[in-house]
Amino acid sequence: MKALIQRVSAASVRVDNQIVGQIEQGILAYIGLGPEDTLKSAQKMIDKILGYRIFDNDAGKLDKNVQQVAGGLLLVSQFTLMAKTDKGRRPDFGGAMPPAQASELFKQMIDYAKQQHDKVATGEFGANMLVQADNDGPLNFILEIS
């Protein structure tokens, strides 16, 4: 499992020109699921994202997590994160979890995130989404759970 997380001052997801998820200050997290991923690894990833200290403390040091700053978490499923790119000039998506299985695990991941944090929004699994983000920093990190 991989996550590309971005510290944002605001972010939103639109599907068919309708906003389906949005947050103010917080983390925009693109989630890539692989065939070996489980509910346990999904929970571990959510815990890591929520605890990752990418917000400034009073001294300007990255020392606070999204919960400590009362920020939002916007989760967006992103199978392309699992692409193999080491050969050729075309991505190979064989490393991604099959869509039906990924949809179910992503739903479970969202449910767990909402149990852990009260400001959780999502995109729409499998939809063509327009994601807008006001990156803060910018600060971007790739997190991996195996």
From Swiss-Prot:
In chain numbering, motif Gly-cisPro motif, important for rejection of L-amino acids lies across: 137-138
Q: Identify the Pfam families for this entry.
A: Tyr_Deacylase
Q: What is its EC number?
A: 3.1.1.96
Subcellular localization(s) per the UniProt record: Cytoplasm
* UniProt-listed SUPFAM superfamilies: DTD-like
Gene Ontology CC annotation, any one: cytoplasm
List the keywords (alphabetical): Cytoplasm, Hydrolase, RNA-binding, tRNA-binding
Any Gene Ontology biological process: D-amino acid catabolic process
Which Gene Ontology molecular function entries are recorded, alphabetically? D-tyrosyl-tRNA(Tyr) deacylase activity; Gly-tRNA(Ala) deacylase activity; Ser(Gly)-tRNA(Ala) hydrolase activity; tRNA binding
Q: What is known of its domains?
A: A Gly-cisPro motif from one monomer fits into the active site of the other monomer to allow specific chiral rejection of L-amino acids.
Assembly and binders: Homodimer.
The task this protein performs is described as: An aminoacyl-tRNA editing enzyme that deacylates mischarged D-aminoacyl-tRNAs. Also deacylates mischarged glycyl-tRNA(Ala), protecting cells against glycine mischarging by AlaRS. Acts via tRNA-based rather than protein-based catalysis; rejects L-amino acids rather than detecting D-amino acids in the active site. By recycling D-aminoacyl-tRNA to D-amino acids and free tRNA molecules, this enzyme counteracts the toxicity associated with the formation of D-aminoacyl-tRNA entities in vivo and helps enforce protein L-homochirality.
| Family as reported in the entry's similarity comment | Belongs to the DTD family.
Q: What is this protein called?
A: D-aminoacyl-tRNA deacylase
Gene name, per UniProt, is: dtd
